[in-house]
Amino acid sequence: MLSLKAQSSVVGKSSSLRLVRNFSKNVRALSQVADETKPGDDDLVQIDLPETSFEGYLLDVPELSYQTTKSNLLQMYKDMIIVRRMEMACDALYKAKKIRGFCHSSVGQEAIAVGIENAITKRDTVITSYRCHGFTYMRGAAVQAVLAELMGRRTGVSFGKGGSMHLYAPGFYGGNGIVGAQVPLGAGLAFAHQYKHEDACSFALYGDGASNQGQVFESFNMAKLWNLPAVFCCENNKYGMGTAAARSSAMTEYFKRGQYIPGLKVNGMDILAVYQASKFAKDWTVSGNGPIVLEYETYRYGGHSMSDPGTTYRTRDEIQHMRSKNDPIAGLKMHLLELGIATEDEIKAYDKAARKYVDEQVELADAAPAPEAKMSILFEDVYVPGSETPTLRGRLQEDTWDFAKKSFAFRD
């Protein structure tokens, strides 16, 4: 059984209220898969990371020993199993042809979205690439809202009009379908935090395949020039589509790509290292040190997208080795057992509850209606409320939309 935290309401006006109401029905705080919090869950526990967890560039690496609470460790485990179950549901729905078009899974990479979110606050902003399902969930969207969007349903986070690559949530600026295009937007989010004197930073994530894009380096330059609180995060999952990193990049130490920006390489398969590095990066940027480049070394178990089997450019033995030796969920489970935070039976109960919850969310998403077959939908959510132009042209003159009338300008 799942108990959900209350989600605070979001304030909006006019047509944005429709967006907020639609989203709020599908939003919840981070899941608490257990029925209740056990006594002592707020007790501090000592975490000792291996020396191989970090490698620094122009900075001293974070402390390898730190303290966190039992409840925080349990929450990260529960979050990761929800994200994985959600991605597995995506795979099944895609094979059933209920999800169509592009769809990119993050199975194997769950530690990054979960570790970052548990290390930052809701004041901070996140933007990433098209592999964004887990980030959307972690920023506050319910599983059913993510899945409904992937299936093109009206109750999706983008009302069924965005699909897999264009998911949004409060404080989460997408999903971006253009390789590397989210990085300058992430720098812009950091500029907004700085301009408004907020104690917050932005996390802009991109893959090793996007790391050679010119706009990434342009963003580095501007962020350093203006000393922005920007955390640039390379999710190095070893392959850009089907191309190994060494075949596309002259230098594969992506954490050093900032040149004049300090960097940190992180074991992205260990959520305890991801969590510590993400907290370190946030503290670094909001303390006035300017931007930082993180490289999360990770691995995707599946192909680049659902249509890619993922075995033509790497061996099955390689994939199995990563699954058996480096799985982030299995790694955290081992720590929970060793630290006495959870028993095998309790972990099995969490896994069972996560499976049940995601199955229920799949049913809700699948039962949701598709967007109405009417042209007026095309003119919704185009402008920030209050900034609309008087009219917006359609394909033909009679398709021109009048925002004041909320109908077509030249139709009776």
UniProtKB/Swiss-Prot annotation:
Known regulation of activity: E1 activity is regulated by phosphorylation (inactivation) and dephosphorylation (activation) of the alpha subunit.
Subcellular location: Mitochondrion matrix
InterPro entries: DH_E1, PDH_E1_Alpha_Subunit, Pyrv_DH_E1_asu_subgrp-y, THDP-binding
Cofactor: thiamine diphosphate; Mg(2+)
Catalytic activity, EC: 1.2.4.1
NCBIfam families: PDH_E1_alph_y
Record carries keyword Magnesium: yes
UniProt protein name: Pyruvate dehydrogenase E1 component subunit alpha, mitochondrial
Assembly, per entry: Tetramer of 2 alpha and 2 beta subunits.
Amino acids binding pyruvate: H104, Y130, R131, A169, G177, V179, D208, G209, A210, N237, Y239
Lyase in keyword set: no
Gene3D superfamilies: 3.40.50.970
